[in-house]
Amino acid sequence: MSQSLHLTTRGSVLEIILDRPKANAIDAKTSHEMGEVFMRFRDDPSLRVAIITGAGERFFCAGWDLKAAAEGEAPDADFGAGGFAGLTELFDLNKPVIAAINGYAFGGGFELALAADMIICSDNASFALPEAQLGIVPDSGGVLRLPKRLPPAIVNEMLMTGRRMNAQEALRWGIANRVVSATELMDSARELADQIANSAPLAVAALKEIYRATSELSIEEGYKLMRSGVLKYYPRVLHSEDALEGPLAFAEKRSPEWKGR
């Protein structure tokens, strides 16, 4: 792996640190590498949760590397599997990703955070989509995901002016799960990751699948889809060894031993 990504495995949790000069910005090469990492995470049955953060204390990720852009890298460059940063278009990822925001998450950095399942941020975190001021648009998910998280007036202001949102505002609007001090950030992210990793992995995969497949449906339509047999993980949960193990472990007052099947 390149010097831009530092990977650590802690039990069933994969930790990814983005470490690039000039604000942890991402060029096409780094994006390809991140896509490879997230696909390996997806396909490795020993891994259940990933945490992604940025190196240093100021920047989570400043988004697309504008130096690379100035040198000729096009906005519609091939950013590899999973889209920009390897995650923004990785729609078949059945495992949760936690973004630990250690500072500025601007442009594609905010889009990367929005593609994660949960966000823990330090109290100095800041979020923005300044693309319109650069003559481009946040087309790596920002213009698509932000309207699903915030009221239209707030979305329009952030998209059209590049207005920054601080950590407390992100918490208030539900963008962030929690805000902690910078020194507590990784401990808080790891605590959350461990809690998720203690859940049955097949059930977690089914939850992601159901949420993704039914979020735009009515409750009635969602029920019909769940019972239609077209989902991949939900039917497997119903007839899994883990579905037997959970109640048995509860009755025997012991920790369950998940098999993922």
From Swiss-Prot:
PROSITE patterns reported in the protein's UniProt record: ENOYL_COA_HYDRATASE (PS00166)
Highest taxon of source: Bacteria
InterPro entries in alphabetical order: Carnitinyl_CoA_dehydratase, ClpP/crotonase-like_dom_sf, Enoyl-CoA_hyd/isom_CS, Enoyl-CoA_hydra/iso, Enoyl-CoA_hydra_C
Keywords carried by this UniProt record: Lyase
Keyword Nuclease (UniProt): no
GO molecular function: hydro-lyase activity; L-carnitine CoA-transferase activity
Active site, UniProt feature: E111, E131
Quaternary structure, from the entry: Homotrimer.
NCBIfam families associated with the record: PRK03580.1 (NF002936)
Function: Catalyzes the reversible dehydration of L-carnitinyl-CoA to crotonobetainyl-CoA.
Descriptive protein name: Carnitinyl-CoA dehydratase
